[in-house]
């Protein structure tokens, strides 16, 4: 299980980066930082199971914060954690398919969303995708 304090701090940093320098530069900054962190300690989980566990931890911690980070900071933080473990995944951005003005950010592994609602593939159309392993 992930410690709440570092995750909460990371969510605040990612949220601030997005607000100050925008999405593209925030994504680059998060990838840059993930590449410079010390190697992760041994984990019992790997691949998709690890991604699902980390996503649940991020969501649980984010829901307790007073500012409630939305999907983009959560997805960027999960992307950084997966990049650090060299787990192939994609950061995705999409828009609602029903015509409502709404966007969403999520992580996919092998084309399947990680820790998302079952209707995500039909509710949102993917507009942008980037591998978390690409620089």
Descriptions of predicted regions:
Residues 1-44, 59-67, 84-85, 89, ...:
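N-terminal accessory/pre-domain segments preceding catalytic cores
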Residues 33-50, 57, 102, 110-112:
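Intrinsically disordered, low-complexity N-terminal segments that are enriched in acidic
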Residues 57, 74-135:
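Hydrophobic/aromatic-rich core segments of domains that either
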């Amino acid at each position: 299980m992930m410690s709440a304090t570092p995750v909460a701090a990371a969510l605040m940093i990612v949220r601030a980066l997005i607000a100050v320098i925008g999405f593209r530069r925030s994504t680059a900054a998060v990838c840059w930082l993930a590449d410079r962190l010390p190697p992760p300690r041994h984990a019992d989980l790997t691949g998709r199971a690890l991604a699902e566990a980390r996503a649940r931890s991020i969501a649980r911690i984010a829901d307790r914060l007073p500012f409630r980070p939305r999907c983009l900071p959560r997805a960027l933080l999960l992307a950084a954690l997966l990049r650090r473990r060299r787990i192939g995944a994609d950061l995705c951005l999409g828009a609602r398919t029903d015509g409502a003005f709404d966007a969403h950010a999520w992580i996919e592994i092998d084309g399947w969303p990680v820790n998302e609602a079952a209707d995500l593939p039909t509710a949102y159309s993917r507009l942008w995708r980037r591998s978390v392993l690409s620089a």
